[in-house]
């Protein structure tokens, strides 16, 4: 893998891959130091009428409050949205299959990308960097860091959510990770030796 990280967030009409539609996708690419490269993209997608009609009320309320619902009629197609995101990603990630998908609880996003934007999804490495995993570990191992983490606006717009995820990982990197350059090789080998599982 190279040092690039592809941050993607999706907004949907719900969480069901069989019934719900992708309505917004945003992407930012960072380097390994979490510096954002370029302007990123944020695209509203016009969903099928059926997906709007069956949208759960809690989701409708959320997308109304964020202003996203009002923008859907002027949204673009899935194919056009994918082309725009892929063009931005390719500008900063030259080789396919090298950069991981990053974000918060990105397993759900990856499912919708695999269904609706397969060229984009397969351009990414199969690994993911999920900030929610770091957060769950911090809650268990470093509760003070967890409970003092940066507040989120919670406006449920894709690009804002990505920016918050990047800021959150920056925070956890500083608050709970070993400062760079980390342990020397001998120390790392000593620690590793303590965690080698016995042969079966």
UniProtKB/Swiss-Prot annotation:
Active site positions: 126
SMART domains according to UniProt: EXOIII (SM00479)
Exonuclease domain sequence ranges: 5-169
Chief localization: cytoplasm
PANTHER family: OLIGORIBONUCLEASE, MITOCHONDRIAL
Superkingdom to which the source organism belongs: Bacteria
Family: Belongs to the oligoribonuclease family.
Protein name (record): Oligoribonuclease
Function: 3'-to-5' exoribonuclease specific for small oligoribonucleotides.
InterPro entries assigned: Exonuclease_RNaseT/DNA_pol3, Oligoribonuclease, RNaseH-like_sf, RNaseH_sf
Keyword field: Cytoplasm, Exonuclease, Hydrolase, Nuclease
Name of the gene this protein is made from: orn
Single GO MF annotation: 3'-5'-RNA exonuclease activity
Cellular component annotations (GO), alphabetically ordered: cytoplasm
This enzyme's EC code(s): 3.1.15.-
Keyword Cytoplasm belongs to the record: yes
Localization in the cell: Cytoplasm
């Amino acid at each position: 893998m190279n040092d690039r990280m592809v941050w993607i967030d999706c907004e949907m009409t719900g969480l069901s891959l069989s019934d719900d539609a992708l309505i917004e996708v945003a992407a930012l690419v960072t380097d390994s130091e979490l510096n954002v490269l370029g302007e990123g993209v944020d695209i509203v997608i016009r969903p099928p009428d059926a997906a709007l009609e069956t949208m759960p009320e809690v989701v409708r309320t959320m997308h109304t409050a964020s202003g996203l619902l009002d923008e859907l009629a002027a949204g673009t197609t899935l194919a056009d949205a994918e082309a725009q995101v892929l063009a931005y990603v390719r500008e900063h990630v030259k080789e396919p299959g090298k950069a991981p998908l990053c974000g918060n609880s990105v397993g759900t996003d990856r499912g919708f990308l695999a269904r609706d934007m397969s060229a984009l999804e397969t351009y990414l490495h199969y690994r993911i960097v999920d900030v929610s995993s770091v957060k769950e570990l911090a809650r268990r191992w470093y509760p003070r860091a967890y409970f003092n983490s940066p507040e989120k606006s919670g406006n449920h717009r894709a690009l804002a959510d990505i920016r918050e995820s990047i800021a959150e990982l920056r925070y956890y990197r500083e608050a709970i990770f070993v400062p760079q350059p980390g342990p020397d090789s001998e120390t790392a080998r000593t620690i590793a030796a303590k965690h080698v599982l016995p042969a079966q």
